[in-house]
C-alpha cells in the first residue's frame, strides 16, 4: 500500500509539473518584434454619407495603434516615418520597389502594409410595417447593415515580394445605428465605436492585425551589421526586443538572380559569413561580438537565429 501511495504521489506530481510548464512556460523562446510600416490606405469607396476626413488616413492610424497594442510589432508614427524616409531619400512606394537596395530598405522596416478601402458605409431598411390594431399601431423596425472592406497587401521590404494579398471585409447588422452619423468621427474613439460602421471597421482592423501576425510569424528578422574598426554593431536594439545573448547569422549577398525579360529579382544568393552574439543592447543599436567566422564587412546582413 505504501508503494502504491508513493507511486500515485509521484505520478500526480509529474502531471502537475507538466501542466505548470505548459501553463506558465509555454513557448518562452526569445523573439524579436517585426518592424511594420503602414502606408495610408487609398479610399475608393462611396462614402458620401460620411462628412469627415479621408477614412483611409483614419483606418491607417487605427491599424498603427492596434499593431503597437499587440506588443508584437515596432511601428513608426507617421511623422517619424516621413522623417526617416526623407533622410534616406526614399518614399513609402520605394519600400515595395525591388530596384531599391535591400539593405537601405531593411534599415527602415521588415514588412509594408498597403490597403485600398473598397467598402465603407451602411444601408437602412424597414422590417415589417405599421399595422393598425384598434388605437394601437405596431411601428416598423429599422435594420441597419454596415459593411467595410479593404483590399490588403502585405509586402516584404527586403525582397519586395507580395507575401499576401486579398480582400478583408466585415458586415455588422443592428436595429440601432448607434449614434448620429453627424457625430461619427475617427477622431473620437468612443463615438466611433458606438456607430455601426465604426464597429465593422474595428473588426476589419482586428482581422488585419491577425493576418499580419500570421504572415510574419515565420519571417526571420534581418538587420544590418555595422563595422567600426574592431567593433561590431547591429542597427537595432531594445525597441524590437533584442536581448544580450541572442545570436545572429551573418550573411553576405553574392548574387541576385533576375528575370531576363522583366528584370524582376527572383532570388538572392547569400554566403554564410559567421555568427555574432549580442553583448550590449541599447535603444536603436546593439553591440555584438563574433562567435564564429571572420572577415565581417560593413553592411553584411544579420539574421536572428531562432532557438
What positions do the PLM features span?
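Surface-exposed short loop/turn segments
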Residues: 91-162, 243, 254-263, 267-269, ...
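Exposed loop/turn and edge beta-strand positions of beta-sandwich/beta-sheet ligand-binding modules
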Residues: 32, 111, 148, 228, ...
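Beta-strand/loop-dominated core regions that host nucleotide or nucleotide-derived cofactor-binding catalytic loops
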Residues: 249-307
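A structural "domain/chain start" motif
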Residues: 21-95, 106, 114, 128, ...
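N-terminal secretory signal peptides that target proteins for export/translocation
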Residues: 1-4
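Bacterial N-terminal signal peptides
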Residues: 8-18
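A residue-level detector for short acidic-glycine micro-motifs
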Residues: 40, 119, 156, 227, ...
Amino acid at each position: 500500500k505504501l508503494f502504491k501511495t508513493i507511486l500515485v504521489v509521484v505520478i500526480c506530481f509529474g502531471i502537475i509539473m507538466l501542466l505548470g510548464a505548459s501553463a506558465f512556460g509555454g513557448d518562452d523562446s526569445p523573439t524579436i518584434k517585426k518592424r511594420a510600416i503602414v502606408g495610408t490606405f487609398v479610399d475608393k469607396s462611396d462614402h458620401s454619407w460620411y462628412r469627415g476626413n479621408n477614412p483611409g488616413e483614419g483606418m491607417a492610424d487605427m491599424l498603427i495603434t492596434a499593431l503597437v497594442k499587440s506588443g508584437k510589432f515596432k511601428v513608426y508614427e507617421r511623422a517619424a516615418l516621413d522623417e526617416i524616409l526623407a533622410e534616406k531619400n526614399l518614399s513609402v512606394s520605394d519600400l515595395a520597389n525591388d530596384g531599391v537596395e535591400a539593405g537601405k530598405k531593411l534599415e527602415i522596416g521588415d514588412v509594408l502594409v498597403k490597403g485600398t478601402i473598397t467598402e465603407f458605409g451602411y444601408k437602412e431598411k424597414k422590417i415589417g410595417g405599421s399595422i393598425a390594431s384598434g388605437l394601437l399601431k405596431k411601428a416598423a423596425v429599422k435594420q441597419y447593415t454596415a459593411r467595410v472592406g479593404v483590399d490588403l497587401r502585405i509586402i516584404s521590404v527586403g525582397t519586395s515580394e507580395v507575401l499576401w494579398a486579398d480582400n478583408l471585409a466585415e458586415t455588422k447588422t443592428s436595429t440601432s445605428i448607434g449614434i448620429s452619423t453627424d457625430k461619427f468621427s475617427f477622431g473620437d474613439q468612443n463615438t466611433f465605436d458606438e456607430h455601426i460602421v465604426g464597429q465593422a471597421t474595428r473588426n476589419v482592423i482586428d482581422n488585419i492585425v491577425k493576418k499580419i501576425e500570421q504572415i510574419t510569424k515565420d519571417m526571420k528578422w534581418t538587420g544590418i551589421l555595422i563595422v567600426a574598426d574592431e567593433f561590431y554593431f547591429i542597427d537595432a536594439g531594445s525597441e524590437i526586443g533584442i536581448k544580450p545573448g541572442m545570436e545572429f547569422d551573418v550573411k553576405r549577398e553574392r548574387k541576385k538572380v533576375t528575370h531576363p525579360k522583366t528584370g524582376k529579382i527572383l532570388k538572392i544568393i547569400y554566403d554564410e559569413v559567421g555568427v555574432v552574439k549580442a553583448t550590449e543592447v541599447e535603444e536603436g543599436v546593439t553591440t555584438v561580438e563574433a562567435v564564429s567566422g571572420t572577415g565581417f564587412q560593413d553592411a553584411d546582413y544579420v539574421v536572428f537565429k531562432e532557438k
